């Protein structure tokens, strides 16, 4: 038995399948979005995990025996989020989502000052990417930013809560504007221009890796 998780911006969906990919049960929980200011779009990461556990409870009621035989969990989720994490593995405030536009000025500045970085990143800087948002946080919420020890992306927050592992895959890394596409690793240059030298970035694995 396997579980597939998809953390979307409007809901988290959980599916229980057998070894033949037959869907046995399905659960979905809505996720609220907060918009504290014009152009801002945020969610509470702890609400994601609460919704996940609630969905697990539903599946356990529907298929208790099958849930006890689960061998693995696959994770997917929305990209480009910025979640600041403290030294106790708890989020510092809300996650800033991909459709948040507060870092428009920072994205424009990065493209103007460092045009050569677009080739390394594989794309120009955009407001929804993690790197520009980290630059915005360093300038506009410096106290919160200084508390942060590392960052995570959406699905990787759930991985941390489920396994205690701080990690990501190349897909989320590539969408962060902190990643060198050719070298397939975090770029010190990107990290520096986004004022994020003191942050620890998660270990990167290929997407199919357990």
What are these regions (language model features)?
Residues 100:
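Carbohydrate-associated surface elements
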Residues 61-65, 112, 139, 143:
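Secondary-structure boundary motif
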Residues 1-94, 119, 147, 202:
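N-terminal glycine/serine-rich phosphate-binding loop of ATP-dependent small-molecule kinases
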Residues 20, 87-88, 113, 140-142, ...:
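Short loop segments at secondary-structure junctions
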Residues 27-33, 107, 162, 208:
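Short, small-residue-rich loop/turn micro-motifs
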Residues 9, 117-210:
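Gly/Ser/Thr-rich active-site cleft segment
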């Amino acid at each position: 038995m396997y579980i597939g998780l998809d953390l979307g911006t409007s809901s988290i969906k959980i599916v229980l399948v057998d070894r033949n990919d037959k869907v046995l049960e399905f659960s979905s929980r809505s996720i609220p979005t907060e918009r504290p200011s014009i152009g801002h779009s945020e969610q509470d990461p702890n609400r994601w995990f609460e919704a996940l556990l609630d969905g697990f409870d539903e599946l356990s009621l529907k298929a208790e025996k099958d849930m006890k035989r689960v061998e693995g969990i696959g994770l997917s989720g929305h990209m480009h989020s910025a979640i600041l994490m403290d030294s106790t593995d708890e989020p510092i405030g809300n996650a800033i989502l991909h459709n948040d536009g507060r870092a428009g000025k920072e994205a424009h500045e990065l493209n103007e000052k460092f045009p050569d970085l677009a080739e390394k990143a594989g794309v120009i800087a955009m407001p929804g990417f993690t790197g520009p948002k980290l630059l915005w946080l360093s300038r506009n919420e410096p106290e919160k930013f200084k508390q942060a020890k590392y960052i995570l992306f959406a699905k990787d927050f759930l991985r941390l809560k489920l396994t205690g592992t701080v990690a990501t895959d190349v897909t989320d890394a590539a969408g962060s504007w902190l990643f060198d596409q050719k070298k397939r690793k975090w770029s010190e240059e990107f990290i520096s221009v986004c004022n994020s030298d003191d942050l620890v970035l998660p270990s990167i694995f290929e997407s199919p890796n357990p």
